[in-house]
């Protein structure tokens, strides 16, 4: 391979020499953007090699450069200020724009490949000057691994810095440690001196001089690349023992204080598939969004110092979020009586050294890099603030983005060794000629960002990124948009959280639930106003007219009231609920007002519509037709929390859920319309589900599915069904309540406040037609008969206390009272979580005649002490649509659901970043 490269370079030299009177000239420019940048891309030994090949090398004078100018001159370089003679100019960091020279080849770290805003003016000047820009960051091998990088020395310097920082932080917490004798990496002449200081600290540790009350120190290294290896190289100079990640918990409590413990974390140690907790490396590379990280629960609680060397990619799990940090900063309970002068650590995690310096990356709350001048900051997760002092509450953070500059001589030699084999072909580059005419190796060719005044084909995406970012910036700079959120129930949390991420939206929360509003206002920067929609029409109107958008999270019966106020004030509106007939009646008024009202933006309806339309539209683009569409969706308790007769729990009023089974439903099956009457007979339509067998699900049709043939544009379908999922046993239990007359919406005077209180036993006696004075055994016997001798249904009634002496809640109707009772019995506890399960099934007939059976699955779990699965999957798409309306991404006017690509496309893409990820599978039948 080397022989082939030499032959290619020899031919290139001959070709260039025929066209030029002199050999190409290379220049090493001085670094003049950052005061700490003392590195160079090549060391004197590399200059010597280049001059031996007969090339002229110019060295710009620099007193800042760590390697003296004399060393470069001794190696054959020519020291001079003017480098206009050079055709190749090498540097480490970006040059000032005014010093760029046209039609030259430059090589440096441009930091433009992600359309970084700070360097876009540089990129513009590079294009204007028709410069050929080679970016070291994109010099990669056939596996995509970087060939030239400073990563090793970033790891070395970062580790030295964080040990110094831990000394300061532990002192602030009341502990002198051997780390106090360590300095910042740049305080040492070279790494050998730093290593000796680390060894000295290690010797003191081995003598048992670490404070006993802080316990064993544990260091976790993420990644196995050069950064991690460089950090471990320093760590190994301490008296250390490496353990497996699963051993970390034990050693963090009982380890030897005369040593420190380390663990190297790879993907398989903390990444697991959301559905089954297994890690598949091949699948992860393709579908990282299917995985979550267990680092926050399995590793971080037993980590003293995290050394992070991995970059975060979109759709991949983060190591730590703000919520994780909050839980990690909870004080550790100890059985040991504290001694005032020998305190225990307030929490295990003391420090994070984020060598990746990837803001908003795998460490979500690392939003700004620190600097060599100010290397440390403290992150207070509870307040979500960063402060410079090493004192107070929080995690010590070090995230310097130019760490190798602290050890400039060794970093220069290391980097130059990797770059040197490619310098000659870069030197033979003629920036005035088309890129295609250059005989570059793939390593160099694929690192060319610009040439001949244009972005190269591989990097044209940068312009699109720029345009997208500039558009977002323009919108954020404009006047704050005003949003009124009506309703403070379970969905409001994710909506408020999502809309609060930027600083360009002023949110007002309106509700008649004062306590809920107060709790939400503590978490989010919002205004609150007490309003009862449906009873305070004038107040609602005055609130709406000052807004840019209204989000209604109220019960669906109140949406028309809100919509009328929006129509009168010409204000856009979104909601998660169904577009009911009452809303449909307002369609012309919405059109006349010239506003946009979007409904059905939640989960079901909502995400189910969006997935259906995306699949249908893609099929139509291929000339295929939809022969069948079946969608089932359900909000359920997590399996471990489903142990009750209904196999169900409620996070909001159960009235809607209960009344759903009383409604008729219709669907299309093999070309025939099937009508289902609600009430007692609905049990006949319940079907056991054969997918997700571990969940033991059943399903039943929901409302009128046949209308979606027109809405979805799939009149070709012979089967069309939308249904509800529940755990097996739910429908049977509810069927028993229907038989007993408990799901009845008619007014029941005996339950009104002015009536005498009733017990459930008395009410049930009334419902089954026996005297209230009847014995419990008599009531049980009559109820059993009423239930058709179904012992399971009887047990459900008994479990809920319906045959006992507990008082019936006051209400307008029996079902309202029953709902209140169910809330008291079957609400989620503080340590319980829910889940949502959805499956969409399509039969797609392709033009070839083949039938594709396609399924789309969604399973989402609620978060402990966070948002429920239902709240996330309903609230987030609603909030996203609201944001799209505010940002002008949705321009269509009128009353609509999320059936157009304009709406569903961005939402389905953005929802993935929130951890709501769909799994798609297809099989083809010939």
UniProtKB/Swiss-Prot annotation:
GO CC annotations, alphabetized: cytoplasm; mitochondrion
Enzyme class, broadest EC rank: oxidoreductase
A GO MF term: saccharopine dehydrogenase activity
Pathway stated in the Swiss-Prot or TrEMBL entry: Amino-acid degradation; L-lysine degradation via saccharopine pathway; glutaryl-CoA from L-lysine: step 1/6; Amino-acid degradation; L-lysine degradation via saccharopine pathway; glutaryl-CoA from L-lysine: step 2/6
Name this protein carries in UniProt: Alpha-aminoadipic semialdehyde synthase, mitochondrial
Cross-referenced SUPFAM superfamilies: Formate/glycerate dehydrogenase catalytic domain-like (SSF52283), Glyceraldehyde-3-phosphate dehydrogenase-like, C-terminal domain (SSF55347), NAD(P)-binding Rossmann-fold domains (SSF51735)
Key word Cytoplasm present: no
InterPro entries noted in UniProt: AASS, AlaDH/PNT_N, AlaDH/PNT_NAD(H)-bd, NAD(P)-bd_dom_sf, Sacchrp_dh-like_C, Sacchrp_dh_NADP-bd
Residues recorded as bearing N6-succinyllysine in the entry: 93, 138, 274, 286, 333, 458, 523, 535, 584, 732, 761
Major subcellular location class: mitochondrion
NADP recorded as keyword: yes
Pfam families to which the protein is assigned, alphabetical: AlaDh_PNT_N, Sacchrp_dh_C, Sacchrp_dh_NADP
Gene name for this UniProt entry: Aass
Family: In the N-terminal section; belongs to the AlaDH/PNT family. In the C-terminal section; belongs to the saccharopine dehydrogenase family.
Domain characteristics, as noted in the entry: The N-terminal and the C-terminal domains contain respectively the lysine ketoglutarate reductase and saccharopine dehydrogenase activity.
The species this protein was found in: Rattus norvegicus (Rat)
Superkingdom as given in the UniProt entry: Eukaryota
Catalytic activity: L-saccharopine + NADP(+) + H2O = L-lysine + 2-oxoglutarate + NADPH + H(+); L-saccharopine + NAD(+) + H2O = (S)-2-amino-6-oxohexanoate + L-glutamate + NADH + H(+)
Function: Bifunctional enzyme that catalyzes the first two steps in lysine degradation.
